[in-house]
Amino acid sequence: MFKLKLLSISTIFILAGCVSLAPEYQRPPAPVPQQFSLSKNSLTPAVNSYQDTGWRNFFVDPQVSRLIGEALNNNRDLRMAALKVEEARAQFNVTDADRYPQLNASSGITYNGGLKGDKPTTQEYDAGLELSYELDFFGKLKNMSEADRQNYFASEEARRAVHILLVSNVSQSYFSQQLAYEQLRIARETLKNYEQSYAFVEQQLVTGSTNVLALEQARGQIESTRAEIAKREGDLAQANNALQLVLGTYRAVPSEKGIKGGEIAPVKLPPNLSSQILLQRPDIMEAEYQLKAADANIGAARAAFFPSITLTSGLSSSSTELSSLFTSGSGMWNFIPKIEIPIFNAGRNKANLKLAEIRQQQSVVNYEQKIQSAFKDVSDTLALRDSLSQQLESQQRYLDSLQITLQRARGLYASGAVSYIEVLDAERSLFATQQTILDLTYSRQVNEINLFTALGGGWVE
C-alpha cells in the first residue's frame, strides 16, 4: 500500500511540467538573398569558408591591440552589459525556483490573559514545518522559467554585441586620431613650403622680377594654411578626447605615428559568401532568443486558462511548556490540496494571451529587421571595398601628376613665363589631394573594420 502511494506521488511529480502549451519554435526564414553579391576584385580568397581570425590577428598594429585590451578592462558600457547579464541570470533563478517544492519552518509564542487581570497570563509555544508545491500540469511555471532563461541568453548576446562594438569603436577612434596627426603634419609641412615660396617671391620683388600682387597672394596662402593648422589642432584634441572616452581612462593617449602605421589584415572571404553567416552575429542571436522567450510567454498565458493545483502539507507542535514542545502527543500534521479554477476575471487571461501573441509577432518582425539590417551592413562594406581602392589609386596618380605640375609651374614662374597664380593653384591642388588621400586611407581602414564586425568578428580574441 505504501509503495502504491509513493508511486502515485512520484507519477504526479513527473507529470507536473511535462505539458507545454507554448507554440513549437520555428526559425523565421531570412528575408534576404541566400548569397551576397561579391565583386571579384573585392575578394581576398579564403580556403573554405569565412572564419573569424580574432581581433588580435586582424589588427596588425600592436598599438591597436593594446588599446582594445585596455578598453575591455575599463569601458563602462561593457561593464554595464556584464551587469545586465548577471541581472538576467538572477531573474531566471528567481523564476525557476517557483517550479520546485518550497519548505518553510516557523516558530512562535502566544501570550493570553484577561483584560481586567482577573485571569492568569498563559503562554503557548508552537513550531512547525510547511511544504508546498504547485503541480505545473499545463506548463505555466515551466514556460515562465523558459522565457527568463531565453532572456538570459539574449543578454549574453547583447554583451557580445557591446564587446564587438567596443572593439570597432576603439580601433576607429585610434585611426581617427592618427588621421588627425597626419593631417596636421601635412598642413605644417605645407606651411613651411608656402613660407619658402613667400621668401622667394619677396626676393623677386626686390629685384623687380615680380609685383606686389604676387607677394600678397603668397601671404594670403600662408595665413589660410595657418587657419587650417588651427583647425587640425582642434580636430586632434577632439580625437584624443574621443579615444579617451571609449578607452574608459584618461591616461595619456598614443602619440603621433602616422596613419600608414595602422595596418589591418584584409578580411578573407570565400567566393560564394552565404547570408547564413549573419546568423552568428550577436544582435541577430539576441533577437532569436527574444523570439523564443516570446513563444514561452504565450505558453504561460495559455496555461492561465486552466486550473492551478497546489499541494500543501505541514507538521506542527504546540505546548504551554517549551521543554515539552516536541514530546510525544504534542504534534499534528495536515495535508491541504488546493485547486484554483479561473471562472471570471473580466477578460484578463484573454487580454494577457493577446498581449503575448502580439509581442511574439513583434519579436518576429524585430528578428527579420535585424537580418535585413545586417545584410545591408555587409553589402555596403563589400560595395565600398572596390570603390575606395579605385579612388585611392586614382588620387595617388593624380598626386604624382600634381607634384610634376608644381615643379614645372615654379620653374615657369621663375623664368617669368607664367604668373604666380599658376603656382598657387598647383600648391592648393597638391595640398587638397594629400588631404583627400589621407581621408580615403582612413575610410578604407574603417570600411574593413566595419566588414570585420558586420560578419560577427571582434568577439574572438
From Swiss-Prot:
One of its GO terms (cellular component) is cell outer membrane. It comes from the Bacteria. It is found in: Cell outer membrane. A lipid is attached at residue 18 (S-diacylglycerol cysteine). Residues 1-17 form the signal peptide. Pfam families: OEP. A lipid is attached at residue 18 (N-palmitoyl cysteine). Its main location: membrane. The keyword Transmembrane applies. Gene3D superfamilies: Outer membrane efflux proteins (OEP). It is a lipid-anchor. Keywords: Cell outer membrane, Lipoprotein, Membrane, Palmitate, Plasmid, Signal, Transmembrane, Transmembrane beta strand. GO terms for molecular function: efflux transmembrane transporter activity. Belongs to the outer membrane factor (OMF) (TC 1.B.17) family. Component of the sil cation-efflux system that confers resistance to silver. May be part of a three-component cation/proton antiporter. This is Probable outer membrane lipoprotein SilC. It comes from Salmonella typhimurium.
